[in-house]
């Protein structure tokens, strides 16, 4: 009996069965990959996006795969909509939430001198304000679950300079620091907080830009761009009971880019 119980505990360390999760921006890209990863591992997932049509298309695919996913329309740059989202999540999951993945985000690439006040406000609201406010709103639900995990989807632009815009980099750097602060403050509530920082990930936009492709491959020791499921797997790991002593960390998923000192890949 003792051996059977030990085996069950070991199995549960690598499962999200019975857990609840909220993933913002889950209708495409990294967010969609995260939703599918968590659901595949047994979690009940709620996700949101601005585009209802895209959400419904995803729902049909998820239902066909047997995933338990609910959805709602939400623009995370809106404080009122964030509050309505969390009220909805609290109702669906009976006041308890195990996992929050603040994934929704956006970017505007311009020289710093060309940014407008509207650009600044929009990027801050979508990337940083939403991550802070949703974490704040989710705190009582995460605490009530007895074991909570927050993952902030940041970027390597929050760790090193990348030519994608100073405001975007500032929001992502702030998210990394937010994860550290919340990890320390909320550890007593058994809530862990980490940030994940992807480098360029394969998307149609990226794949159609040959110059960008060449530059990324030159600067990445592994010589290739990453795939969405190589990021979602880390997000899932950070939510496993097996990761119960990992908190306050900023983890790059970048094929070695951030430790490459911006060196171009040599021709051998």
Swiss-Prot record:
Q: Which cysteines are joined by disulfide bonds?
A: none
- Catalytic site positions: 168
* Keyword 4Fe-4S applies: no
Residues that hold NADP(+) according to the record: 22-46
Q: Where does substrate bind?
A: 155
Which enzyme class, named as a word? oxidoreductase
Record GO terms (molecular function): oxidoreductase activity
- The EC number(s) this enzyme carries: 1.1.1.-
The answer on whether this UniProt entry bears the keyword Oxidoreductase reads yes
PROSITE patterns in UniProt: ADH_SHORT
Q: Which UniProt keywords apply?
A: NADP, Oxidoreductase
Q: Tell me which family the UniProt entry assigns to this protein.
A: Belongs to the short-chain dehydrogenases/reductases (SDR) family. SDR65C subfamily.
- What is the name of this protein? Tropinone reductase homolog At2g29170
């Amino acid at each position: 009996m003792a051996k059977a119980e030990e085996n069950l505990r070991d199995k549960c360390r690598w499962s999200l069965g019975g857990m609840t999760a909220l993933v913002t921006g889950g209708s495409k890209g990294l967010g969609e990959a995260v939703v599918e990863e968590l659901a595949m591992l047994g979690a009940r997932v709620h996700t949101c996006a601005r585009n209802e049509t895209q959400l419904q298309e995803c729902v049909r695919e998820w239902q066909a795969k047997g995933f338990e996913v609910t959805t709602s329309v939400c623009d995370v740059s809106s404080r009122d909509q964030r509050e309505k989202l969390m009220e909805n999540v609290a109702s669906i999951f009976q006041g308890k939430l195990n996992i929050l993945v603040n994934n929704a985000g956006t970017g505007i690439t311009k020289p710093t001198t060309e940014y407008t006040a509207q650009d600044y406000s929009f990027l801050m609201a979508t990337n940083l304000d939403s991550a802070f406010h949703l974490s704040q709103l989710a705190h009582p639900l995460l605490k009530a679950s007895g074991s909570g995990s927050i993952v902030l989807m940041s970027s390597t632009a929050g760790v090193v300079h990348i030519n994608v815009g100073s405001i975007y980099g500032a929001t992502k750097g702030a998210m990394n620091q937010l994860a550290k602060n919340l990890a320390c403050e909320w550890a007593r509530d058994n809530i862990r907080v980490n940030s994940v920082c992807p480098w360029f990930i394969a998307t149609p936009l990226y794949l159609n830009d040959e110059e960008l492709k060449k530059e990324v491959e030159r600067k990445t020791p592994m010589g290739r761009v990453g795939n969405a499921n190589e990021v979602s797997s880390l997000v899932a790991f950070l939510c496993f009971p097996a990761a119960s002593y990992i908190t306050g960390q900023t983890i790059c998923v970048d094929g070695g880019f951030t430790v490459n000192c911006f060196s171009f890949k040599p021709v051998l």
